[in-house]
Structures are given as structure tokens and as C-alpha cells.
Amino acid sequence: MAKRDYYEVLGIDKSASENDIKKAYRKAAMKYHPDKFANASDAEKKDAEEKFKEINEAYQILSDSQKKQQYDQFGHAAFEQGGAGFGGGFNAGGFDFGDIFGDIFGGGGFGGFEGFSGFGGSSRRSYVEPGNDLRYNLEITLEEAAKGVEKTIKYKRTGKCENCHGTGGEDDKMKTCPTCNGQGTIRTQQRTILGVMQSQSVCPDCHGTGKVPEKKCKHCHGTGTAKETVEKKVNVPAGIDDGQKLKYAGLGEASQNGGPNGDLYVVIRIKSHDIFVRDGENLYCEVPISYSTAVLGGEVEIPTLNGKKMIKVPEGTESGKLLKVKGEGIKSLRGYGQGDIIVKITIETPKKLTDKQKELLQKFEESLNEKNYEQKSSFMKKVKKFFKDIID
């Protein structure tokens, strides 16, 4: 029987976010949870079991960005046994089918649910918790953000102990956890007004693995971890914006119970610029021009990220006018298109004039009339009409 599409199994489309995928999994998994079929017929139990396995298989693939990418490209063939470059098929053994119910019910499971015990399978449910994610703020210049740059960062993290290879045991020797008898979880009961409520939580001694060291590692004292400094080259793509993150899977902190490392998130912080203000892919700047250039028009030099550029200022330019310089902004992070530079013109009033300059300016002013001042002329006409209406 051909496998159903994983997106169809969870009732979502390919554009679904990580949060949407998790919500869809919760809904589907709870619908076919074993506790809901405790009194059902054998046929109904078998059908629910198959659907439940199918739901968890779909979630394991779609919740992992790398596996999701492989599935989107190759479909189910990406995970078939012997598939080239993908290392075998789906393995439910290492997947925590109950973790989603712990999210909902505070770690207590759903009615004592452990693995596939509701379907007659093994009751052992080990819980492998990943290491913590790390965040690193990387400060770069606007020019580096525009053109892309390679940076080397150093950060401290909790890594795996080299002596015990992360097991916490001297010579890697482990034994069954006596607290949980190798189950990885402990169960407690509490009397409430609704009756006896049963909950399940991760074993505090083995952290869900079901194993503890026969003898604690002398280097890490049984934690399986050690502090270390990591050096990493970070390739910052051209067009990246302030606050955007670069994710490096597995470069976060090590797990204390043999689980996968957390992830490293490099958060980009762009330094403020002396000339430009960025808005998306556009750059804004103010360029002061002389009074005569504003009146007569001309060319002015402006800065760009690629060097100097001359732009034309039209005759009679007002202060505050915006001039667009196409294609001199930031390249799109998606790889197509480029923003513009938006130049805001400001007219600088000359100061510290000599008597001769003042005299020449006065004569020039006297030579002008209403036709030379369209806005002033229009305003004065409105003022005259305003007072005329009051008097009438």
C-alpha cells in the first residue's frame, strides 16, 4: 500500500510554519491517542494504531528542517532503505511519541500514556532532551550587510566531555537506573476531587535515558558535559537586515542525557550609519544644496555604497523634495531586484554674509515679483479672500 503524503496526513500545506506543523500534529495525535480507543474493538484499535504511527512518522520528518527539505525534493524515496545519501528509512524507536502530550498536560502525559503501551507494545519510554539553543549577536556595518561578508566568531558553550564522550560514566560504563528501573520516567499519583490522577515525568536521575554511570566520570563528575570555546566562520549573505537570524544546527549546547546538541542562532545587528538610514532595501539620506543651486538647478555629488555619483537637481527645487536614484540601494536577500537611494534635498540658508553680499541679495530680491513666488502669491490671495469674507 502506497504511503500517504505527509502534508495530507497532518492536514497542512507545504507553506505551513513550524508552529503550524506542531499544532496540526497535536490535533491529529490526540484524535488517535490510545486512551481514546481503550474500549474499542480490535479492528478499531488496529486502525487507530496505524494512523497514530503514520501521524508521528509525518511529524518526525516535517518538524526537522533538513528532513523536510529532502522530503519536499524527493518525496518518500528520500527515506526508503538504501536511498542514496539518506541513510535508511524511518525509525520510530528513537522518536518520542509522547512529548507533545507533555507540552499540553505539563509533563504528565495523557492518561499515563507511555510509547505504544495502549496498543500492547513496550511500556518503556525514554526521553531524550536536546541541549539548549544559543544566541550570538553579530555586529556588522551597513556596507557589509549590503555586500555580504564572512566573519569568524568565538563563543563559549557547554560541550560533550571528551573523557566520557558525553555519557557521564568513567570508561563509558553505564547501568540501569535504579530510580526508574530503566524506564526513563517516573509515575506519581495524586488524589483530587475528580479521583486519583496519575501523572508521568522524566526521571530526575537518568534524565530520561534509563541509564546512569556505574562510576561517575572524574572529569565532568557525571554530567557528561564540559565548558569549551568554539570558533565558527559565519557567512553573512548580501542583503541581510538588522535582527535577522542565521541558524547553525547542532552548534548549541550539548545535552546532558545523550540527546542532540541545541542550535546556534547568530542574530545580525547592523551599526548605525553616518549618512544612510535603511528601510528594507531602500537607503535614505539628506543632501544639503546651496540657495543658487535650488533656484538655478545643477548637479550635486552624492555618496553611494559603490562610490560617488552625480545627480541632477531640477531648477526651482524646494527644500524637502525627494529625488530617487534607482538601483543604488540594497540587493534583495532573495537574490532578485535591488532597492534605491532616496535623496531628501535640504536648502541651506547662507550665513555670515558681508555687507556687499547683503546689498547684492537685497537688490536681487527687489527685482523679483509675484510671478517668481508662486506659493507666496497663492497664499496672499487666500489671506485677502479670508479677510474680505470676514468683513462682508
From Swiss-Prot:
The record's note on its domains: The J domain is necessary and sufficient to stimulate DnaK ATPase activity. Zinc center 1 plays an important role in the autonomous, DnaK-independent chaperone activity of DnaJ. Zinc center 2 is essential for interaction with DnaK and for DnaJ activity.
Originating gene: dnaJ
Annotated family: Belongs to the DnaJ family.
Complex and partners: Homodimer.
Protein name per Swiss-Prot or TrEMBL: Chaperone protein DnaJ
Superkingdom, natural source: Bacteria
Lineage of source species: Bacteria, Fusobacteriati, Fusobacteriota, Fusobacteriia, Fusobacteriales
GO cellular component: cytoplasm
Cofactor note: Binds 2 Zn(2+) ions per monomer.
One Gene Ontology term of the molecular function aspect: zinc ion binding
